[in-house]
Curated annotation (Swiss-Prot):
UniProt GO cellular component terms: endoplasmic reticulum membrane
Name of the gene: cyp1a1
Subcellular compartments: Endoplasmic reticulum membrane; Microsome membrane
Family in the record: Belongs to the cytochrome P450 family.
GO biological process: hormone biosynthetic process; progesterone metabolic process
Cofactor(s) annotated in UniProt: heme
Coiled coil: none
Protein function: Cytochromes P450 are a group of heme-thiolate monooxygenases. They oxidize a variety of structurally unrelated compounds, including steroids, fatty acids, and xenobiotics.
Descriptive protein name: Cytochrome P450 1A1
Catalytic activity: an organic molecule + reduced [NADPH--hemoprotein reductase] + O2 = an alcohol + oxidized [NADPH--hemoprotein reductase] + H2O + H(+)
Protein keywords: Endoplasmic reticulum, Heme, Iron, Membrane, Metal-binding, Microsome, Monooxygenase, Oxidoreductase
Amino acid sequence: MVLMILPVIGSVSVSEGLVAMITMCLAYLILRLFRTEIPEGLLQLPGPKPLPIIGNVLEVGRNPYLSLTAMSKRYGDVFQIQIGMRPVVVLSGSETVRQALIKQGDXFAGRPDLYSFRFINDGKSLAFSTDQAGVWRARRKLAYSALRSFATLEGTTPEYSCALEEHVSKEAEYLVKQLHTVMEADGSFDPFRHIVVSVANVICGMCFGRRYDHNHQELLNLVNLSDEFGQVVASGNPADFIPILQYLPSTTMKKFLNINDRFNTFVQKIVSEHYTTFDKDNIRDITDSLIDHCEDRKLDENSNVQMSDEKIVGIVNDLFGAGFDTISTALSWSVMYLVAYPEIQERLYQEMNETVGPDRTPCLSDKPKLPFLEAFILETFRHSSFLPFTIPHCTSKDTSLNGYFIPKDTCVFINQWQINHDAELWKDPSSFNPDRFLNADGTEVNKLEGEKMMVFGMGKRRCIGEVIARSEVFLFLAILVQNLRFHSMPGEPLDMTPEYGLTMKHKRCQLRAAMRARNEE
């Protein structure tokens, strides 16, 4: 299941610790003897001095996005830390990151050969693969073509412009009814619990062409798998940074492999069913689209890579995981901000009421006519920065950036949180202010401001599902804003402190929601 590996290290056993200590001592001495020579005219990377055994792990701490942002103020936009045996270059600053990922994209498009990455889709994941050509390039092109084809699929009735709009609209309307029912029964609801099930249902519809009841065990199993995956990976895998540990027994790694195997088995079953019922003239979902593109060989003309059933399973796995946790986290944060800023929530409703009205369901074509809602989404992405880092990059060759030499195969962290909270880029970055993304008269989104915000990565490894993800968040939120007014629980302060993990989530809490009157002004 594809999610994001973050720069953290979990707990280790006594035996792991002893082996690691010996290994690190030897490695430290070897590295001291065989330092990479810096080419003339380039500078050595700055950064905090690492300890011989653990590197800079203590300084990185439990909230790397904050500690590495603080380090960037001291060492600059390009600096180096050491985690275990692995040197890591940390990039901050919008211009520096754009220079690396776009202007020097080929040099920074790699993925580090982390031990964990090898077991995600057998090392051939779209998101985590260390390969930059051949299989990875063909698989990425295939996935992009399938997504593009799916985006043009018609809905089952004329009221929907496309299949995506139909899936999201129906699920969002059902979510409104569910929250109303839960409120009548319990008087409060857990926003993340209900949103995550709804988003899982949408991604099941998109990938597999099926929708579940919210209490269906198969759907809940998927949600639980994702939660288990997040808990296991968020703790970090020491073997990623201390390679000798991969040869020792690891309970965490066993859980990690088991979760991936269970999800792969589920996807394999559905892909097999799709092959049995596939009809080229009736493409139902993304899996059908992948099968269709494989059969038509719509790949790079220069690529001889053959796409097997197993590869389709892997791509579906990638797309499901990438579109699940990210979107559910974004929507959950959006609801929290609605509650935290009731005046903004009312302004969003007024825009919705004046533009769409109370009787028609919002649709994707309404997006340009709802600039404040779009600005609210952008500010939610920026302020929460729920994806504080991209998936780690890696240099594909010896290169330089801002005058500093960076050797080939160096692991690179991109600090998206720092970019989204950079005082040189944003006025009063700690304040939540959607208006920062609007033009002077508030009638449309300022595209230049919107492009400054970073959440989906950049360059050759940018998220291929970004357009669909943005559309899904917009439509879900539009329907929620039109139909519900969200409140905090009386006497319970809202805690917006993020909890660091695969994606940064808010603390679980209970909220209240009330149906809007259809003629409400």
